[in-house]
Regions:
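Charged interaction segments
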Residues: 24-32, 41-107
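Short, extreme N-terminal segment that most often corresponds to the first beta-strand
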Residues: 1-26
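Short, flexible, solvent-exposed loop/turn segments with mixed acidic/basic and small polar residues
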Residues: 1-4, 34-42
């Protein structure tokens, strides 16, 4: 069963975040971009990829690109797969919850 990897700005987002997310997804096979400036009063902007597993090389590349974006824009990104919150990327680094899901060792 296929699912979606979804990553979006968890902080207040603006046009700069939207432009950066669009560029992050561009050129990556299967990756998409979304931007809803009025969802519940807070702008929601992010990227997605249909993927069965987080081990998919394209999924890993998208996570890496979004991590770089998070660091460059000093923002927090929520990461979901199959509509389950996996954790956050904070200023380019996975939080403890996301690091465990991705199999990264502790600090």
């Amino acid at each position: 069963m296929s699912g979606y990897l979804v990553m979006f700005v968890a902080d207040e987002a603006d046009d700069g975040h939207a432009d950066a997310m669009r560029e992050t997804a561009r050129g990556l096979r299967g990756a998409g971009f979304f931007d809803d400036p009025d969802l519940g009063g807070q702008r929601t902007t992010g990227t997605y990829l249909e993927t069965d597993t987080l081990e998919d090389p394209v999924a890993l590349e998208l996570i890496a690109r979004v991590s770089e974006l998070s660091d460059a824009l000093a923002c927090r990104i929520e990461v979901q797969h199959r509509e389950i919150i996996l954790g956050h990327i904070v200023y380019g680094q996975p939080d403890e919850q996301l690091a465990a899901v991705l199999g990264f060792g502790g600090p």
